[in-house]
Amino acid sequence: MARIAGVNIPNHKHTEIALTSIYGVGRTTAKQICLAAGVSATAKIKDLNDAEVEKLRDEVAKLQVEGDLRREVTMNIKRLMDLGCYRGIRHRRGLPVRGQRTKTNARTRKGPIKPIKASK
């Protein structure tokens, strides 16, 4: 099992698909990485030699992935919350940020329904 950017890459998958297991690398980026490294996107990871895996490592190292990217996203959200702007307030309250309706739906973001206790 190859290890790229601190992530174990599955051996049995095609290179393009296997690279998507790295946080911050999607299908398009994976194709670009394979093209830049000169590695076939359809070759399986187990069939690649050490030199090809090293080329992939070098290409991924040029990108902002995994911990650095997660940290940046977290800091961006924290910055919005500290500013007190509309998006920051929505993040703070745990509500949808991008204008979705909340009268109905939005249960994923709002959490389970809290029942109203009947008063006697």
Curated annotation (Swiss-Prot):
Gene3D superfamilies: 1.10.8.50, 30s ribosomal protein s13, domain 2. Residues 94-120 are annotated as: Disordered. The gene is rpsM. The lineage of its organism: Bacteria, Pseudomonadati, Pseudomonadota, Betaproteobacteria, Nitrosomonadales. The keyword Ribosomal protein applies. It comes from the Bacteria. GO terms for cellular component: cytosol; small ribosomal subunit. Pfam families: Ribosomal_S13. Belongs to the universal ribosomal protein uS13 family. This is Small ribosomal subunit protein uS13. Keywords: Ribonucleoprotein, Ribosomal protein, RNA-binding, rRNA-binding, tRNA-binding. Located at the top of the head of the 30S subunit, it contacts several helices of the 16S rRNA. In the 70S ribosome it contacts the 23S rRNA (bridge B1a) and protein L5 of the 50S subunit (bridge B1b), connecting the 2 subunits; these bridges are implicated in subunit movement. Contacts the tRNAs in the A and P-sites. One of its GO terms (molecular function) is tRNA binding. GO terms for biological process: translation. It comes from Methylobacillus flagellatus (strain ATCC 51484 / DSM 6875 / VKM B-1610 / KT). Part of the 30S ribosomal subunit. Forms a loose heterodimer with protein S19. Forms two bridges to the 50S subunit in the 70S ribosome.
